[in-house]
């Protein structure tokens, strides 16, 4: 039964593919394989055809582990702050103002509307870090306009879905907060390391739009002159009015982290207050919006923490079954040394992203590859490794058949937009 840990991992993946909630898949698998692999059933007088691999008493520290590594974790306090900030900004009207202004600013160019979606996606990512909110908001606002001006359905949908996922990599990303906790790296270091790659990714999206506009002009036409109704000083004033609020929030949150003025948790709290001030400035701060924002924040934060509890139980049982030793032995014996390990782990994460969500990969796979990465690359390179993982996880929102950004988009798109 030395490979019982691999059966446990396979059972968890199978439950996730069937559609069971992540927390219950991980926790339920932990309970099942505790019964199979521990001395619990033999202690009740039931004989097993194999020797128990660990004593049930080993799990007595599970409550302490949950409260010590989850409930008392100061870093994870940043999660509800960033979620609150993102949801509140969604309700503040920031996206509407940005899309309208950027559409007028870039509208004279072929592909200008698509470029404006990428720019707004990057600004929303640096302001909110919530992928679902960004994709849905831009799909509701930009997709009808793009289709109206004869943009191809494929380009319109692809640009909106891809730009919305920039919130995965451009800080303040909730994914980076969770990933930093899982690999033992400062969230501030991950934010700093991911900022430039995130902007480069947005730049590559713009280059792709420009390439499509040059090679297939009918797919991305320029806006007609009558649609660009602002020029000169009026356009400049509108651009400044649209850009200053999100840039202020970006500087408030990321600037304080990068320059060491505040921790990510403290910056998240300031960002939450800043989002409320922006909503007040746009006359969108109502009691209903505030209650809705708090409700969504509690729901998403609770989901993350319940998954953490299930992942902690899964990790403890997997380790008790000596799964960590099997993983270490396998990864350390891959051909190519550290580069073979890097290629294999990145390929594995990418392929898993076709079938399971980023949060499942973060809680199931990352904790077991992080110690090997630390051994190969050293602590000074772990932020770099974390950013690579985050970039890879970002693709899980787009890769079919379970790309969540595609389903967010389809949920608000007109019937003419199909997933096939």
What are these model-derived regions, one by one?
Residues 1-420:
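Alpha-helical transmembrane segments of multi-pass membrane transport proteins
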């Amino acid at each position: 039964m030395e490979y019982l840990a691999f059966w446990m991992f396979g059972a968890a993946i199978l439950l996730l593919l069937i559609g069971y909630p992540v927390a219950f898949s991980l926790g339920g698998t932990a309970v099942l394989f505790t019964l199979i692999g521990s001395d619990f059933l033999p202690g009740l007088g039931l004989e097993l055809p194999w020797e128990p691999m660990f004593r049930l008493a080993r799990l007595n520290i599970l409550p302490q582990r949950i409260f010590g590594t989850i409930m008392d974790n100061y870093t994870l306090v940043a999660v509800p702050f960033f979620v609150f900030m993102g949801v509140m900004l969604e309700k503040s009207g920031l996206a509407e103002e940005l899309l309208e202004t950027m559409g007028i600013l870039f509208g004279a160019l072929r592909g200008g509307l698509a470029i404006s979606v990428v720019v707004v996606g990057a600004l929303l990512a640096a302001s909110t870090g919530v992928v679902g909110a960004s994709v849905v908001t831009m799909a509701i606002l930009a997709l009808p306009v793009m289709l109206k001006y004869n943009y191809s359905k494929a380009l319109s949908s692809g640009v909106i879905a891809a730009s919305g996922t920039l919130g995965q990599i451009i800080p303040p990303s909730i994914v980076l907060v969770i990933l930093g906790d899982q690999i033992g790296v400062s969230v501030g270091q991950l934010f700093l390391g991911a900022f430039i790659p995130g902007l480069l990714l947005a730049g590559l999206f713009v280059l792709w739009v420009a390439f499509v506009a040059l090679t297939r002009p009918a797919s991305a036409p320029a806006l007609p002159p009558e649609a660009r109704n602002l020029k000169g000083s009026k356009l400049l004033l509108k651009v400044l009015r649209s850009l200053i609020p999100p840039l202020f929030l970006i500087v408030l949150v990321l600037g304080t982290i990068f320059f060491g003025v505040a921790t990510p948790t403290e910056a998240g709290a300031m960002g939450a207050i800043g989002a409320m001030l922006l909503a007040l400035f746009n006359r969108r701060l109502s009691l209903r919006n505030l209650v809705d924002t708090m409700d969504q924040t509690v729901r998403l934060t609770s989901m993350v923490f319940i998954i953490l509890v299930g992942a902690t139980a899964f990790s403890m049982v997997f380790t008790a079954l000596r799964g960590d030793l099997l993983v270490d032995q396998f990864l350390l014996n891959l051909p190519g040394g550290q580069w073979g390990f890097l290629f294999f782990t990145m390929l594995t994460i990418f392929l898993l992203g076709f079938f399971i969500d980023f949060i499942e990969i973060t809680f199931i796979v990352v904790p077991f590859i992080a110690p090997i990465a630390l051994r190969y690359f050293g602590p000074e390179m772990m932020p770099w490794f974390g950013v690579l993982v985050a970039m890879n996880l970002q693709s899980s929102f787009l890769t079919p058949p379970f790309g969540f950004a595609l389903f967010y988009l389809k949920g608000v798109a007109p019937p003419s937009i199909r997933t096939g």
